[in-house]
C-alpha cells in the first residue's frame, strides 16, 4: 500500500479559550486607549508601544496562562520542555478597511496571537510559504487544481473566538487581509527559551 509522509512539518498550535472572558474584556478596555502608534502600511491599524508582562496585572495574568502553551510548543520544536518567557507584548486595533502586510518577527523563536474580539471570516490571519531563493519558479496554478498541504502557498487560521491563542515559529511569514468587519483587536507577543544546548555548545537568552 502506498504511503505519503509529510517530512519535517512546521508546528502551529491553536489553543481555544486560553484567556477567559473576564480577562479578555479587561485587556480590551484597558489597552484600546493606549494604541496610538499608526501602522506604516495602514492608517486603520493602530498598535500600542512594546509592553512587558510586568507592565500590567492583566499582562501578568495573561502570561501565566500562555506560558504553559509555550512550553508545549517548545517541546515540539526543540524536543525538550524548556523554561520559556515572553519578551514583549503589544495590542493591535484594526478598524474596517485596515490590513497588516506580510511580515515575520525577528529576535524570537515563538510568536503568538491572542484574539480579543470576534473576527470577520475574511479577516483571519494568513500564513505564507517562504518563496525561497531567486532562482526560476515553476508553478501549476489555475482554477482546476486541488490545493493540498504540499502545493498550497498560503494557509488561513480557522475561525477564532475571543480568548483563542495561536502559536507559531517566529520566522513564518504572515499577514492580515483587509478587515471587512468591526474593530479587530489582538494581543501579539514574542517568546524565547532560557537557552539551548547542542551537545555542550550552549547559548543563553535574556528578556
Q: Where are each of the predicted segments found?
A:
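Helix-adjacent hinge/juxtasegments
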Residues: 76-87, 91-92, 98-105, 109
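Catalytic core of non-heme Fe(II) oxygenases with the double-stranded beta-helix
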Residues: 95-165, 193-205
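Non-heme Fe(II)/2-oxoglutarate
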Residues: 1-81, 92, 204-207
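Short conserved micro-motifs at the rims of enzyme active sites and ligand-binding pockets
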Residues: 26, 179, 198-201
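Short beta-strand His + acidic residue motifs that chelate non-heme Fe in jelly-roll/DSBH
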Residues: 100-103, 174-180
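A structural signal for short, well-ordered beta-strand segments
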Residues: 89-91, 112-114, 187-191
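Short, compositionally biased
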Residues: 179-189
